[in-house]
Each structure stands twice: as C-alpha cells, then as structure tokens.
Amino acid sequence: MAIRVQVESFDAGAEVNAMHAANVGVGAVVSFVGYVRDFNEGREVSGMFLEHYPGMTEKALAKIAVEAEQRWPLLKLEVLHRIGALEPGEPIVFVAAASAHRQAAFDACAFVMDYLKTRAPFWKKENTSEGARWVEGRDSDHAAADRWK
C-alpha cells in the first residue's frame, strides 16, 4: 500500500505502469483520476485550494486502504491526493488497485474513492465567478459510501 499527500502534480500513466511493473502477478490495474473542473453548481471555477489535517489525513487514508486490502485480494493499492492551489484541468486525486483479477480491482478502487470522499479530512475552497466558497460534501457521496456497509 502506498499513501501520498502532496503539493506536486503526478503522472497517472506512470503511476499505473509502476504498479504493473512491480509485480508480474498483476492481471488487472483499475485506476481513478479526479480533476479540477472549470464549472461547478452553475458557477465558473477559476481555481481551488485544498487543505488537509497533516498526520490525521494520512492516517484516515491508510485506514481506508487497510480496509480495502482486507476486503479484496489486492497485490498493490495506491492513494495519492494533492493539496494546495490547483487550477482547472489539474489532477487532484489518484486511486489505483492491482489484483490478479479485474473485479477485485474495480471494487477496491470504487470503495477507496467512496470512502475517501466521506471519511478523509480534506477541505476544498473554490474560487468562482461569484467569489471564493467552501465546498460542502454531497449526499450522493454518502449514499455511494453507504453501499459498502
């Protein structure tokens, strides 16, 4: 398992290739990359600032990853989340799960993203055409996480 919280951008393709190269038993790698949108809830977004609680955020992500590893036969799991100032089009989050078979990788990747959105202490502040605003969690994120209970 690899957990990273960082300011720097990342190359999702290189991350996936590294996961596969590290283990010849990998039959499937499923990944998700989230990007900063230029539009949200009817407002133009010119940028975003992501804050986190150092130490606590990494522990929360590790707890989610451990639960995924207990639920599915994974060979590798990576969670990478950016913080700081971001512009539309930039990657925010990368989650990838590697397994011998695709279904475990699909399920684990979805589980980690659903739990990350509801259980990891990140705060998003969007700069919009109407000023800056903190982004609230969505009911749909909680509903998605509830399916794993």
Predicted regions located by residue number:
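Short glycine-rich or small-residue beta-strand-to-loop segments that form or flank ligand, phosphate
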Residues: 92-99
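N-terminal, polar/charged subdomain of small-to-medium soluble alpha/beta proteins
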Residues: 1-92, 106-110, 114-149
